[in-house]
Amino acid sequence: MERTDVVVIGAGVIGLAIARALAQKGREVIILEAENAIGTMTSARNSGVIHAGIYYRPGSLKARLCVAGRDKLYAYAKERGIPHKKCGKLIVSTDETQIEKLTQWHAIAMQNGVTGIRRVTPEEARKLEPEVSCVAALHVPISGIIDVHSYLLTLLGDAEAANAILALRAPVLKGEVDGDGFVLDVGGETPTRLACRTLINAAGLGAQEFAKKLTGLNPATVPPLVLAKGSYFSLSGKTPFQMLIYPLPVLGSSGLHASCDLGGQARFGPDVEWIDHIDYRVDPARSVLFEESVRRYWPNLPNRALQPDYAGIRPKTARASPHDSDFIIQTSREHNVPGLINLYGIESPGLTASLALAEEVMARLA
């Protein structure tokens, strides 16, 4: 049986950020990833947005780690040459009934320490983005976008430079608490048993499934997994926007927004579809809903200009808005198993928060 100090399950942005932090502190780390490449699930199927920290309950892990992680991510991307752009964001109210809610989000942003945010008039909004239609808006200059794949590769490179080992196509079939550590049954082309002293469950959509297969962990400590599918539609033709354009948040999502990747491709999404099983297909019929929603803030959207693009699935623990839910970082204080950290509900703003979240995990292991 092979032995190591630390096993990290999952090679998305969260798992890789944690593995990097542990390896750079001299820990012996093995990263187990069930897929045949890094970051193929939640990490690859999102908007690639660096969030400011507006949508989260003051004092929550999401709020604290998003704001701290945002600054760390910008600094890291600049230092390491990861393509990114601080393009800014407009959060728009499209009718008078939404203005009170916009005011509330402004107040929450200030409580969370978001700097530079300001209320703008419809005229000011149109000076920033001539195609936008709104009755009021918030301008958030600190928001941006990042090349997620480059970020993933850089995290992995740092971890491997500190002697971490990545094993792809290595699903963890089950595990058990064993003395002062853990024993894992790992599948794949060369099945093996692997013992470790510290175990980080950063499996994303698979976190609850693995936790239930870990003998010695009380299953009552495992929260439910709620799947929130979000589809994206891309725009055929040139984007009219320089910034991110966000409507007000809705249940389960920060809104069906307009974003643009670093290559200039505009897309809209995600919407929210509560599902019972993993399904990444995008229903072309949803374009009707998308067109209706987008035209509230971009009336000049051309007919039939939206094409199905891709879908992502957010690993929630409840049917709740971003403001009403939070990350879950379970340690022995919650589940009474020393050396085990379970990460649940790491949805948006997980990408933005990833470096700060890794530091949080390090602190809880100390």
Residue map of PLM features:
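Helical element adjacent to the flavin cofactor pocket in flavoenzyme catalytic cores
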Residues: 138-198, 355, 364
